[in-house]
């Protein structure tokens, strides 16, 4: 067995991926393995985000820390898949190098050339924004609007949201699975109709979200 920081990946999986026989869409065992890799990657990224939150709680600028650290979150998120040979390490360097589309959405994210211009400006605005609630709502929204990566944008966007939550004294906030449709609907309104209010209300209504749960 091979090991990636405590995560065990079988030689059989490595060979299956190498030979092109790994098919999680058709094979339940392969699908379970993919879920395991995703879970391990999420855990690794979560540890990295917690380290970023410590910097924020120590007085660091949340926008600057997000700019400095989000690439590391992304690498951790897909690290187990790199170890398994499912993803190439080079694919995790920088932002996406192609067009990406969002299933069941009318919103088409900006092209890859625009991403290179948008992301530095995005983080600059996060660094300058004085209101934590604005950083939470618009930070999450604009990140997923741009969709800078080929995959994992929602997870990284929620990590970013929680870093901004910490900067305002709010607790860690999750999006329950049963609220997923509400989340997507609110983001669609913001992305297509330019109406951010449903998304702001959605976040405020989440477990841990909203001023009513702010730590003092």
Q: How would you label these PLM feature ranges?
A:
Residues 1-216:
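FIC/Doc superfamily catalytic core
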